[in-house]
């Protein structure tokens, strides 16, 4: 139903900017590009084209499942190990609740760590051979990011590579069809042995990993992805079509078409109860 959407943003809920923001800016290389008065700010890695919108939800914000995380790419396996050791050293300084052990998972060599806002984050590396299986495993950047930003850390975050979603284990194939046929996103060819699937837009290398789960913890709209389509006219038409056919394609919630600061958008909740924002250029 959506035609050639572009994945332009991820959205991320934390408890306090004061606690979470230093993790992003000092450990992951993110930069704040916009600040809003409604409890959100927009960050971007200089080497990556999409943004991450951070929502400050207060002390009651829940811990998010591990498989609702975002991941950053480094340039070597040794950098993954070095990053892990560095984060262990600064764990108390940044109030990191945990720093995991590097391991191989879904072809990536990576580790997870927690941040004080209730979320998990990943640092990963893919061997060059992996890029032969899928382009998403190759570098997402045109040139390496400047090392001085990470001086003394032993690693350099080259870019924000992916986000993640969950779906019900029993609904994996219907959800794949929804992503492709309704949201208009591409399904990345992957080795058949992987239990997950990847979705992305037609224009950019970053992607979203969908992880089937037996037990789910459903999140609110502060944890969502933003898809941008061609025009406001196309946005109105898409909203009308979803309103007419939403039950047929198993949409669980459809928000009103809104305009805010000259920007038009609407929210929808998909069959897996994940949230999306659909918008158009101003």
Where are these regions (language model features)?
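Broad, structure-driven detector of short, well-ordered beta-strand segments within folded domains
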Residues: 50-54, 121-123, 206-210, 276-278
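Vicinal oxygen chelate
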Residues: 6-15, 44, 61-156, 240-282, ...
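N-terminal beta-strand motif that seeds the catalytic metal site of vicinal oxygen chelate
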Residues: 1-21, 70, 129-176, 225, ...
